[in-house]
């Protein structure tokens, strides 16, 4: 069911002006475009069989669409002032549960104990993007896909490929467990209040075959990775000296995986870095 874009945009603006001022401490920037909500649902492939988790429903603009199209939606909202509004707005919706809690403090083990194949769809506070993603990835056994509205440069970083200047520890932290894709750019004017930067919609699909986890323990992988990225301006041969390796030895190992002596961490894919670790430990 399509909503009238202008009507609902105006309704949200009125609610914000009369009853709820967006709170900077929660990083609130509300979606104001019905067409954008439709595009999000299409890309995330939300249907009557989908269980969805939303973080920060805000004024319920995207929430309404998720309820209409999914099997069940659970939403976490931290803002005390929004709870009465959301409860009233969706009081007759049987496939909706609103949890009044800070998502970062939620016991997701309890939440996921009877849930599998969940999709996460959310317009999240940008200042805690990494903590939210890390927390969700802890429950990758229960989650199939994650779709997040994030700051544009963060989406570029997470979905970047080897040799990109955006390749980072965060890139590997996500791509070790999942495939990440930059889906589309969202102009800042699509939000109320208007933020300072553009946003992007990011897709993260969990690697259910444990493609990389089956090859190496996450503890070992991230031990090397954190050192490799400890100083992005320095070469890996310099950074890995913190783990007790001589620079000459690391340079020889780099040659064996087709890299130059001055190679930096951003040149590696996840698989490439796993192969490099294996050479280091032989």
Where are these regions (language model features)?
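Catalytic cores of RNA-modifying enzymes
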Residues: 1-219, 223-227, 266
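C-terminal lobe and adjacent flexible extensions of AdoMet/dcAdoMet transferase-like proteins
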Residues: 227-282
């Amino acid at each position: 069911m399509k909503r009238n874009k202008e009507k609902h945009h105006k309704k949200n603006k009125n609610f914000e002006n009369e009853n709820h001022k967006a709170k900077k401490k929660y990083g609130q920037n509300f979606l104001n475009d019905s067409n954008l909500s439709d595009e999000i649902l299409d890309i995330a492939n939300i249907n009557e069989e989908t269980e969805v988790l939303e973080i920060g429903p805000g004024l319920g603009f995207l929430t309404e669409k998720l309820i209409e199209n999914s099997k069940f939606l659970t939403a976490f909202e931290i803002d005390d002032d929004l709870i009465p509004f959301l409860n009233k707005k969706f009081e007759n919706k049987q496939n909706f549960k609103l949890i009044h809690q800070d998502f970062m403090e939620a016991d997701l083990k309890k939440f996921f104990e009877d849930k599998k194949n969940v999709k996460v769809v959310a317009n999240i506070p940008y200042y805690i993007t990494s903590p939210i993603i890390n927390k969700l990835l802890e429950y990758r056994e229960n989650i199939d896909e994650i779709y997040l509205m994030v700051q544009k440069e963060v989406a570029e970083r997470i979905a970047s490929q080897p040799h990109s200047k955006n390749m980072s520890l965060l890139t590997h932290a996500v791509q070790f467990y999942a495939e990440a894709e930059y889906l589309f750019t969202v102009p800042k004017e699509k939000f109320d209040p208007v933020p300072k930067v553009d946003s992007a919609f990011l897709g993260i699909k969990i690697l259910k075959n444990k493609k990389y986890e089956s090859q190496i323990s996450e503890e070992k992988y991230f031990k090397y990775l954190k050192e490799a990225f400890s100083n992005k301006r320095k070469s890996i041969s310099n950074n890995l000296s913190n783990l007790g390796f001589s620079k000459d030895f690391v340079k020889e190992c780099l040659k064996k995986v087709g890299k130059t002596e001055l190679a930096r961490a951003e040149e590696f894919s996840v698989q490439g870095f796993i192969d490099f670790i294996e050479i280091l430990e032989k």
